[in-house]
Swiss-Prot record:
Monomer. It comes from Blochmanniella floridana. This is Translation initiation factor IF-3. It is found in: Cytoplasm. The keyword Mitochondrion does not apply. GO terms for biological process: ribosome disassembly. The lineage of its organism: Bacteria, Pseudomonadati, Pseudomonadota, Gammaproteobacteria, Enterobacterales. GO terms for cellular component: cytosol; membrane.
């Protein structure tokens, strides 16, 4: 049973004429397949089909195992360099008391210092929905209290369902 490969190599290539690139990366030109496979075998390397859709297909003489190793290594390096953005959510209500507000504010400051984005959700219950301006004031107060630590990415213009949502991101620290 043959395993799936990204590229056809050596005798798997069925085209008679190919555009050949040498092991050093220089263009050799359009050659017969048998001549190309002979050159690869003389160098004890593989003939790898790089671009099968071009006319004629492009093949390169290389060490296929080393090529796959380098490719896997570079994709792992790229994954390491990617930064995953975590979002922490803090919930408020229009009538959140001062003590609770301060505790939640401390948590937001801690999360911002740790580099997290913050999703602040302001939930309305019952008749509170009539007083949307109170909710907007709470969100403005939060942004005023934290203006030196964060930037507001999304500020709500209206109530969505029974809640308003604001997204905060930590300010970039000077290097």
């Amino acid at each position: 049973m043959q395993s799936f490969r990204l590229h056809r190599i050596n005798r798997e290539i069925t085209i008679k004429k190919i555009r050949l690139t040498g092991a050093d990366g220089k263009q050799i030109g359009v050659v017969n397949f048998n001549e190309a496979i002979k050159q690869a075998e003389d160098l004890e390397l593989d003939l790898v089909e790089i671009s099968p859709n071009s006319d004629p297909p492009v093949c390169k003489i290389m060490n296929y195992g080393k090529f796959l190793y380098e490719k896997n290594k570079s994709t792992k390096e790229q994954k390491k360099k990617q930064k995953i953005i975590h979002i922490k959510e803090i919930k408020f209500r229009p009538g959140t008391d001062e003590g609770d507000y301060q505790v939640k504010l401390r948590n937001i400051i801690k999360f911002l210092n740790d580099g997290y984005k913050i999703k602040i959700t302001l939930r309305f219950r019952g008749g509170e929905l009539i007083h949307q301006q109170i909710g907007v004031r709470v969100l403005h107060r939060i942004s005023q209290d934290l203006h030196d630590l964060m930037t507001v990415e999304i500020f709500p213009n209206k109530v969505e369902g029974r809640q308003m949502t604001m997204i905060l991101a930590p300010k970039k620290k000077p290097v």
